[in-house]
Each structure stands twice: as C-alpha cells, then as structure tokens.
Regions:
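Beta-rich, blade/repeat-based domains predominating
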Residues: 36-55, 111-132, 164-178
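Residue position within the beta-strands of beta-propeller blades
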Residues: 58-59, 136, 182
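Short loop/turn segments immediately following the C-termini of beta-strands
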Residues: 61-63, 139, 185
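Blade-level signature of beta-propeller repeat domains, shared across WD40, Kelch, NHL, RCC1
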Residues: 174-191
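Single conserved hydrophobic/aromatic residue that forms the stacking wall/gate
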Residues: 1-13
Length: 191
C-alpha cells in the first residue's frame, strides 16, 4: 500500500507498480486513476494492517483539531475539505461539520489536536492484554495512547504516558517479544 497525502487519497498498487484488479471504481469518476483506494484523507500519518482482521487502519492530522484514527475503507470518502472532523482552519474559521451521512466515520477523533503521528495494532507477548488495541503516538502532546476498539466501535482510550520523551514520530513493535520502540523527532529511540 502506498499513500499520497498531497492529493487527499490513499492509493493501492502492487510493489511492482501494477494495479490490483479489485480496486474500487468511484461513481461518476471514470477519469480517476485506477490505483485510488480511498479519498478524503487530509494528512495521513500512520498506517498498519491488523494481524487480527487484515483491515488497514490509519491516523490522520486534522487542521487545528480534528485528528482521527480510523479504518481505510475500500472505495469510500472521509470527506476532507467538506468535513472538518471537529477542527478549524489555522485562521480560526470553521471547515465543516465533524461528520455527516455519506462519509466514512472515524473510530476516534481528537479536538483539540494531539498531532497524531504513527500507529500500530499491537500484537505481542510483552503486553498480552493490549493485543488488538491501537497504539498511537503524537507530536503535539508527546504521548503514547492506547485505543481499545471493536471493529468500528470506540471502547476506550488510555494515555500510557505524556510529555516525557519529546515529540514521538514513530512506533515499532519487536515481532518476537512484543517490545515497543518509540522514535522521537530528535532521533532518539526509546524502549
């Protein structure tokens, strides 16, 4: 999977550049590129394929607020530039409603913005009780958050820690042990 933030879309193609035959067709958009998988995403940051249900999940930066975590949905539209997900433009003007029918709905929204960055769906031995939960890093409030969810239903959010190591840019899980590694903007790696 490849994403293209500049054009507010997610693109899906094979590593060799070929387009999957089952990519969606958007109604009334016959001239759109065949690799487009989903539209209406403002500023995608993190993406992971769940080892539990094989669905793709992502984090997105809103403008001033309106960050979200949700599922990348085949052929659907998250509504960017029509919807503001609760955020406002940097000038303070309203972007649009948080959500409305006809658009994909995120699992979790953040207003004010946390500047959601990377994310993973946790699978490991180190924190077995977290298996299947989303671990989401943030830049603005420098936090690691755990989101418990079931399909598209938000259950709970826990801030594991905040304001301790700086702006967290990336998260990786050691496959064999489930240990968590965090990478900050300063280039530090934390375990």
């Amino acid at each position: 999977y490849r994403s293209s933030a500049a054009s507010d879309v997610y693109k899906r193609q094979h590593l060799d550049g070929k387009i999957p035959k089952d990519n969606p067709k958007f109604k009334g958009k016959d001239n759109w590129l065949p690799e487009i998988y989903q539209i209406g995403v403002r500023n995608p940051q993190g993406m992971d394929v769940s080892p539990y249900n094989n669905k793709i999940y992502l984090t997105n930066h809103g403008a001033r607020g309106g960050d979200w975590f949700g599922e990348a949905k085949y052929g659907e539209n998250y509504g960017w530039k029509i919807l503001g997900w609760g955020g406002t433009n940097y000038t303070g003007t309203k972007i649009g409603p948080k959500w409305k029918p006809g658009f994909s709905k995120a699992i979790k929204y953040w207003v004010p913005s946390i500047a959601a960055s990377s994310m993973v769906i946790y699978k490991g031995e180190e924190f077995k009780e977290w298996n299947g939960d989303a671990l989401i890093t943030s830049l603005r409030d420098q936090s690691l958050r755990k989101i418990k969810f079931n399909d598209d239903k938000f259950i709970s959010e826990e801030i594991i820690f905040k304001d301790k190591i700086g702006r967290i840019r990336d998260i990786e899980i050691q496959e064999k042990t489930g240990e968590i590694f965090l990478i900050t903007d300063q280039g530090s790696v934390w375990k």
